[in-house]
Amino acid sequence: MSEHTPRAARSDLVADTALALLAERGMRGLTHRAVDETAGLPQGSTSNLARTRQALLELAVRRLADREARVLALEELPDPRGGLDSLVDGLALATHRALTRNRELTLARYELALEATRRPELRAYFDATGARFRDQLTTLVSAMGSTDPARHVLSLVAWADGLMFSCVAGSFGSQAPGLAEVRASLRELLDGMFGR
């Protein structure tokens, strides 16, 4: 990478490399030096962008949120006017992608989430970035007629996180369910949730 790389592009490269290292090596494998070496950057480049470990972790969390927000293309996002089928299709597709083509991001997210339990300053940052997704989901379930949006969002997030953790890091890690299986499970959950 050139010494003259724009700061935003270098920041993305550092954050993407940090996420890849978290997925591959875990929290212990994430160091400023490892990011420099893996990204092919001159030594000290990562430190120039993120002086402290906390700053590097925050950079990774911010990039994770940006990349996860783009898991679905605009035309794939659930449309409340499309009813329950639209919600099921969109959420199932996002969950399936987290298990398959975005598996590395999912692993990195779990590494960061666990680290956030030991670092209050990271917890606050991690929770704030996650609030964007929760707010969007709250809007969707409210539009579907949820009588208790906060509880329903918690149930949906718990279902998705449980499935993703089990299939990425848990005892079901050898094979991710197919999109049809994810969709069927989600449909069962939402049918019960909305009394259909």
Residue ranges and their predicted role:
Residues 13, 17-59:
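Helix-turn-helix
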Residues 62-68:
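Short, basic, alpha-helical segments at the C-terminal edge of helix-turn-helix-like DNA-binding modules
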Residues 69, 100-107, 118-144, 154, ...:
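Amphipathic alpha-helical packing segments from all-alpha helical-bundle domains
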Residues 70-106, 153-156, 179:
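Hydrophobic alpha-helical connector segments
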Residues 52, 115-120:
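Short loop-to-helix capping motifs
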Residues 13, 17-24, 71, 108, ...:
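Solvent-exposed, amphipathic alpha-helical segments
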Residues 16, 22-23, 41-45, 75, ...:
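Anionic, Ser/Thr-rich low-complexity intrinsically disordered regions
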Residues 3, 123, 127, 142-196:
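Hydrophobic/aromatic-rich alpha-helical bundle segments in the mid-to-C-terminal region
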